[in-house]
Amino acid sequence: MFRFNFRREISKYTGIYHRKIHSGLEDAGPMASRLKSRSVVRFSGPDTVKFLQGLLTNDVRRFGESSGEKNSAVPTPNMASVTNPPMYAALLTPQGRFLYDFFLYSPSRPDEKLDRTGSGPGSDSGRDGSVELFADVDVDVLDELLETLKKYRLRSKVDIENVAEEFSCWQRYGRNLTGSSSVGWGGGVDRAGESTASGNKYGWQWYKDPRLECLGYRSIFPSDATPPLVEADKETDESNYLLWRLEHGVAEGSAEIPKGEAIPLEYNFVGLNAISFDKGCYVGQELIARTHHRGVIRKRLIPLRFIDSNGKELNQKIAAGAEVVESGTGKKMGTVSTALGSRGMGVMRVEEAFKPSAELAVKDSEEVKVEAIKPTWWPAEWFQQNQSGVAAA
């Protein structure tokens, strides 16, 4: 089976990055990227929600609720019929370390979609009452992920299927994004949405990224179709999506979140809406709950900028795993997890990284200085907790 190695492919686009960053990535957009680093898995069967609820960090129960219970109105061209937005979640080891991340989607059922005229509900033919969910997952660990899920399945009535050939993952991001929460079935008779839904019983549409508004829109679409609005946007390589995430300090997949090692709270999974503290037990829940209620997360994933002594950006290749130290003393402050050109991100000691007097550098490359960047989306208490030692994670 074809496998896309994102670590290897990213190295090809360093030149693209150099040109992009100096033209102002923060002002670029809108852009759309097909995410070759991601794949799609389908879950179906009466035990789908129960099965995932016992495994994942987020509360999956809302996918089992009938949309009719929430909204009894007949869908109209001015009323979106899709009521379940996507969800971000993770599967952990029993010790509470990161294994895999998931973007979960609930497709529109046929009776929840408008007909082709946009004037009424579609046919409910083929509905068998079972729950169906799709997951956008890391392609590099797909086979391992499927084996792990099937190991946990036991007697659960849930089918787990690789549908990578049928569907692709996409992201829309950057500045000046046009509204797209109503694109597709149930969001009005939009010709771009119709062209994508045509011949596709699922009627996929764009959704706001469940992690952060600044990340844009995300969804999965049939592999043989162009998603709505992509033709109007600039379709660009996935490396630019990595750059966008580096700007905001958001990691994704096992290439950036070390499998079996990373502590989800240090990778800001609470702020990324990936963890529910009200759902009850799941695999690895004990460590997450204990760490959260202890109150202080001293290390977090932080955006980094690599510069010289004059503050000029350095487009040098910084390897993942490189240590960031305090200049002069050599005290370790953190570790680079991902880097491309002059930008990166790493798990750092928050208090030390953001000290005004902090002088950081890459270990054994003292000419490469490191600047920690405060993400605009971070809640104020994340900065305060390391000063007071009492704020919640």
Curated annotation (Swiss-Prot):
Recorded family membership: Belongs to the GcvT family.
Q: Which organism is the protein's source?
A: Arabidopsis thaliana (Mouse-ear cress)
Give the main EC class: transferase
Mutant lacking the gene: phenotype: Embryonic lethality when homozygous.
> Mind telling me what this protein is named?
Putative transferase At4g12130, mitochondrial
- This protein's transit peptide sits at 1-70
**What function does this protein fulfil?**
Folate-dependent protein involved in Fe/S cluster biogenesis. Functionally complements an E.coli mutant defective in ygfZ.
Alphabetized, the UniProt keywords read: Mitochondrion, Transferase, Transit peptide
| Expression sites (tissue/organ) | Expressed in flowers, siliques and seeds (at protein level).
